[in-house]
């Protein structure tokens, strides 16, 4: 193992350890975590089992099958709240090491280290299941690059059973693969994905209903559709007179995603670069941009970055961490011009700038930047390059 590899593993373990401390139930104050709220409080502590029971409000467990399975295993090994939290944190750290391993395989450079030290890993690393999903998705892409298509399809399906986002890779594989390779990949994905769905179909239906009933969450274009802002983001709780504005905002967002995604799909690029760009396309348009979702980018992002992207990465990450940091301190965090929504808008600006920079780096577009602005970016990039280049 080279020096940079050692630093990468130490970085991600350090960030996840800090996240463990921030979200720990014994910390005061303690940041909210979904594993302690959506799972432990609503299910494990009350003797309920995801999919077999519902939380007190009548809602189902909101995460797919593998997320529930990992939670059940951790609570079985851990016993009480403290034991569960320690077991879960150690599990996330193990997947964090896998995430770092895959990220280094995609691009072993100083920018990878910057990604592995992202504030999102500190603020949201132990929040939910995002590190696990990102690590499994990265492993599936790494196996795909190594032409191990059956294993890749299996692991991609497992990642989709933690969170759905990884299915964004399927169209790329359908276009890229031919003949038996395509058949092996799709069969492996379909069998692995559909097996638990066939075993517990009602749970899958509940999951689809739950996530399709969501409104607008931290989407930058709430400034364009202020009438779509509502403190409760579930559509069933929204007054009928607001539905037209919410639907218009959703159509606007998904139209942005589809146009950008089709553009990315048309580029001739490698699987890890495709994942980085397609995730950017999705989160620039999605009506629901949960701040913990930034973790999904981290294994792939360095593959489409150079040092000139460093200012935009810092802006994007700082704004993303600010969303949750300001959310509970705001009297009406869902409204435009409140601190969380301003942070979401700045986050979009940083992400859009990284997307344009990545497209320019890959030769997909040409951009002209004013000389003074370009000089400032280059100076900042050189400073960052000198700092991380020593690592």
What are these regions (language model features)?
Residues 201-248:
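Periplasmic/ER-lumenal interhelical loops and adjacent helix-loop junctions
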Residues 1-208, 246-391:
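Multi-pass membrane glycosyltransferase architecture that uses lipid-linked
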């Amino acid at each position: 193992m080279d020096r940079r590899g050692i630093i990468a593993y130490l970085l991600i373990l350090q960030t996840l350890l800090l996240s463990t401390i921030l979200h720990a139930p014994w910390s005061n104050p303690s940041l909210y975590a979904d594993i302690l709220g959506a799972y432990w409080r609503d299910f494990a502590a009350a003797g309920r089992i995801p999919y077999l029971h519902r939380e007190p409000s009548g809602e189902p467990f909101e995460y797919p099958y593998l997320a529930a399975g990992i939670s059940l295993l951790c609570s079985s090994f851990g016993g009480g709240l403290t034991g569960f939290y320690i077991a879960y944190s150690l599990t996330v750290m193990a997947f964090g090491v896998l995430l770092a391993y895959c990220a280094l395989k995609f691009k072993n450079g100083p920018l990878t280290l910057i990604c592995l030290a992202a504030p999102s890993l500190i603020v949201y690393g132990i929040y939910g299941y995002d590190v696990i999903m990102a690590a499994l998705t990265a492993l599936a892409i790494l196996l795909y690059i190594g032409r191990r298509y059956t294993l890749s399809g299996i692991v991609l399906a497992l990642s989709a059973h933690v969170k759905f986002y990884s299915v964004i890779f399927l169209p790329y594989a359908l276009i890229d693969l031919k003949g038996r390779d395509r058949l092996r990949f799709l069969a492996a994905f379909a069998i692995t994905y559909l097996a638990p769905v066939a075993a517990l179909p009602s749970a899958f239906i509940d999951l689809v209903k739950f996530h399709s009933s969501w409104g607008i969450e931290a989407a930058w274009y709430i400034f364009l559709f202020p009438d779509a802002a509502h403190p409760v983001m579930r559509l069933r709780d929204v007054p009928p007179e607001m539905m037209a504005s919410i639907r218009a905002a959703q159509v606007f967002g998904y139209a942005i995603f589809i146009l950008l995604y089709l553009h990315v799909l048309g580029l001739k690029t490698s699987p890890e670069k495709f994942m980085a760009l397609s995730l950017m396309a999705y989160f620039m348009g999605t009506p629901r941009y949960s701040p913990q979702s930034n973790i999904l980018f981290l294994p792939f992002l360095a593959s489409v970055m150079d040092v000139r992207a460093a200012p935009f990465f810092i802006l994007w990450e700082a704004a993303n961490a600010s969303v949750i940091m300001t959310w509970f301190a705001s009297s009406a965090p869902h409204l435009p011009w409140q601190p969380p929504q301003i942070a979401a808008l700045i986050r979009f600006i940083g992400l859009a700038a990284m997307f344009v920079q990545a497209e320019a780096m890959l030769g997909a577009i040409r951009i002209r930047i004013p000389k003074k602005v370009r000089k400032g970016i280059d100076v900042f990039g050189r400073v960052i390059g000198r700092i991380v280049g020593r690592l």
